């Protein structure tokens, strides 16, 4: 089984700086100031790492600090200071994150840290870049240009949707991104939590219509960071992401820092496999509406329909880059797809495409050899006679 490597960028990150004693206590109704002046924080004010903060804010804006635990509302903008009312208080410690609901901050999308990380990824031949906090199509375009200019033309971009702007612009983002990730953790800070399930379903459905790969991620088996077994609610969450039509589902803290990483992967895989068997993909295919825009789309759709009509055991697709395989995969045909390619990089990346069994094969110099190899691979992979 090929394994692709994804590099996760830091993305635009807004944080407060440090306090004299490491932390303070804020109470509802307090006045607290965010400043671009370089100071050591105290009970009344703290520095931020974003120099254009005052230009981007306006009176009445809300600032969510420490993953939304603390809520500030801008009362006055004065010089380098944003003077705020504390709407929801709590303990505030060094270097906590800031979020700005329903705002697009005017910043360069790629920081120096991001560029250094991307150059590392290019040097080490990663397959995907997960682009954090994508707000608009231009963010993806800036990343694509940087990759192309530095030898990363083959690296594909997965745009992480983590704010309202990303949701609102998802269709144009999908025009140039190679897929999206629904990063529900930060999305649930930027957007009221009650909206996240509906937004998840909207984004997955939109991607299915557009033929774009979509990963559902974050807090899927969160309790398994500390516990050997998931809750029933978490298993239902995993299953619902599969029912909705996710191309892939993803663990984060559970496998990166949890006590039971193997058990978490096993529980997620077993739940996904069982759920897949309960879905009537033939019925979904017959009732689905797709945005077919090209001859390749039309041929791919017809291939799936024909495979269903003749009760084919599998569909074999040969492709150098993997693009044609992905075009067939987008229709979620209830027939296994064998994706043959001579490119090791394409072979690894095809593992993210729904319903595809990637096969790395030798180069061929004629159609006859290609068909012969395809038949042999189909028999081997599908255990056909």
What does each of the following model-derived ranges do?
Residues 1-385:
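Non-catalytic helical/linker scaffolds that mediate oligomerization, partner binding
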